[in-house]
Amino acid sequence: MGKGAREKLLIFYYICSMDLKNLFSSITRSLSGGKLNLNNLAGKVESKLQSKAKTFTFQALPADLAALKALPEAALTDPYATAALSLLALGQFQDNKAASVEMLDFLKGPDKCSPSELQLISDRFMDGKFYKVRSFFEGATPANNYTPSQPYTVKVSSTPYSFDNENWATLYLHSGGSDSPRPVKLRKKPSTGQWFLVEIQYLGDIRTPVAEDKWA
């Protein structure tokens, strides 16, 4: 396929995936010297159609806020890192809820965890389902009762639509007990360039670990 045909095809896909307001804004920004700059617009299209994934490795799970802040990811300038840290913060929810909430509050930045948010998290862990957190670390599966490999590794991914809204992101964590990645919402604070946690949406039910599965 020639370069010109490729650009036109990409632009066609872009148009199909946008509403009219966003399309008009993109075309306006792509005008150069009174002519439509196809290279710029095609570049945006290609970027939009790509997905991305990052992995983060931790030697140990932080026991408290001080330990969390000591991690390089705690600069919070990378939304993928903030998403990964949200999982680490939940790692203490069973044994030290106060420390877990303190870490979550740090990740939420200008906001704090509301009583309703904390209740929702508690509900997700009902009946001892704290294995949900472990399931997101590499190597954890129902067959090994969600025992993570060491060191702890977390994969965070995006879709072509994860950053559609300016200063907002929906990223995804991958559980060994689910066929589909689970979302987490984040928001950027432009004045600091940091990405903060907005909503944890990845704690839905997953496959039962073998030790608790009466049908295993």
Please place each PLM-identified region on the residue numbering:
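Surface-exposed, charged secondary-structure patches
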Residues: 118-177
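Short beta-strand edge/turn micro-motifs at domain boundaries
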Residues: 179-215
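Cationic, low-complexity basic patches in intrinsically disordered or flexible, solvent-exposed regions
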Residues: 9
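Short, flexible beta-strand-to-coil junctions
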Residues: 17, 88-95, 174-178
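Intrinsically disordered, glycine-rich low-complexity segments
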Residues: 1-6
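Short, positively charged and aromatic/hydrophobic N-terminal segments
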Residues: 13-14
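Glycine- and small hydrophobic-rich membrane-insertion segments that are intrinsically disordered
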Residues: 18-56
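Core segments of small alpha/beta cavity-forming domains
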Residues: 47-138
